[in-house]
Amino acid sequence: MAEIENRPSNFIRTRIDQDLASGKHASTHTRFPPEPNGFLHIGHAKSICLNFGIAKDYNGLCNLRFDDTNPEKEDINYVNSIKEDVQWLGFNWDGEIKYSSNYFDILYDYAVELINKGLAYVCFLTADQAREYRGTLKEPGKNSPYRDTASDENLALFEKMRNGEFKEGECVLRAKIDMASSFMVLRDPIIYRVRFAHHHQTADKWCIYPMYDFTHCISDALEGITHSLCTLEFQDNRRLYDWVLDNISLECHPQQIEFSRLNLEYTIMSKRKLSDLVVNNHVEGWDDPRMPTIAGLRRRGYTPASIREFCLRIGVTKQENMVEMGMLEACIREDLNENAPRAMAVLDPVKIVIENYDADKVETLSVANHPNKEEMGRRDVPFTREIYIEREDFKEEANNKFKRLVLDKEVRLRGAYVIKAQRVEKDENGEITTIYCTYDPETLGKNPSDGRKVKGVIHWVSASEAITAEVRLYDRLFSVPNPAAADEFESTLNPDSLVILTNAKLEPSLANSAAEQGFQFERTGYFSRDSKAKNIVFNQTVGLRDSWSKTQ
């Protein structure tokens, strides 16, 4: 066993420790089994970190297996995106990628075994009839009229299903368990159905496909999984998981353990609802930076380390709860504060003219890329007579609490000089167009020699050397903490979740930034270079501090 000092503690790991100590298992073998019918989201990241994290901490194995039993909704593009997301998060699966479809021949043989044992039968009830026969939570179901068909006849019918001699919906193969069971999942569940659909792995070899509950447990057993971890909605399904494995000739019997899924404030995790957002053009796609998908978080500027840290902090329990969005944002904020280089960007620019600075002069200033990490180096920032500052950083009149630029008062420019506002120029609407200032040439990197105090510091960029870029400011996608609870979840969308600024002025070094590279725009927030835009676009990742909670 690996060293345990830094391992997270939870009930699953306690169970694993007990199994290893008792000799039930010599090592651990977990798996992450997504269905390739959509893009992974932050909820899947919790399962990824749990399963791959256990393999890492216990020197065990973790498989990546695609649960590809529903070809009509699956696509090879989803397969590829899931592989990319898992690796981007920092994990690698053991051995070859697995597919449930790899086991279709074996699954068919086990279905035949159940038929031979009198534990499965071909049923011709319509969907409406089957629903009626199933009963309710308060009333037991009743047996299908096809339940007692002889095994030989069922074998022949099942072979006809495989040969495509029945239409879709005409018949299914059902497990024969107990129509009076208090657990609905045990009331003769469907284990095979007819589907004339092209499969991304097996092409047109099959026209019958096994159901998830039949496939999942057998796939686990075939791969030697020791601990099959899934979310709480599959708790009742564990009884079917165990029933299948107890009634076929497979020695390996993995243990299914359930944990609570991730519920995150101000977003949704339902694939169907996320798809609705895309289809109805509420977002720009599955990788829209407002989406909780891994692709969306990545494009917004979240790092793999921040997502792993978030999954570590929320822990693993059986208790369903709503996690504050602020916890996720705190993880990326801490990561970027520690690791992101600094840069200056003016999002709402107003021009300053420094009247006593040479009009033709371009001075190159050396500015640290990180205030606490000398190893991150320095960069050159051009300083000129005309610069831009944030419009909100200037007032004609202000009290002493306003530590920025005010008429007849001084402020320091980050990494440069102290300037003093002398007068302003306005347009016909009274909007300030230019602020005229003077500078103290003796204050580069030092305080005024006469001892006067200059308390405020603001950021700036050179007007002539700056690059113009688009900056996208993001807010919560929804305006309520639990949009999934609303009758019409789309009615809770936040109309101000995206603000696009087209005239931001950035220091020229940012022109050479790489896609997905994160920065702290000084005094503004954390931003990431967009990975899809042809022009220079920066997406806001998160603010410098959690201002949202203070306004609630």
UniProtKB/Swiss-Prot annotation:
A motif ('KMSKS' region) lies at residues 268-272. Its EC number is 6.1.1.18. Belongs to the class-I aminoacyl-tRNA synthetase family. ATP binds at residues 35-37, 41-47, 231, 261-262, 269-271. L-glutamine binds at residues 67, 212. The gene is glnS. Its main location: cytoplasm. Monomer. It catalyses: tRNA(Gln) + L-glutamine + ATP = L-glutaminyl-tRNA(Gln) + AMP + diphosphate. A motif ('HIGH' region) lies at residues 34-44. This is Glutamine--tRNA ligase. Keywords: Aminoacyl-tRNA synthetase, ATP-binding, Cytoplasm, Ligase, Nucleotide-binding, Protein biosynthesis. The lineage of its organism: Bacteria, Pseudomonadati, Pseudomonadota, Gammaproteobacteria, Alteromonadales. It is found in: Cytoplasm. GO terms for molecular function: ATP binding; glutamine-tRNA ligase activity. PROSITE patterns: AA_TRNA_LIGASE_I (PS00178). It comes from Pseudoalteromonas translucida (strain TAC 125).
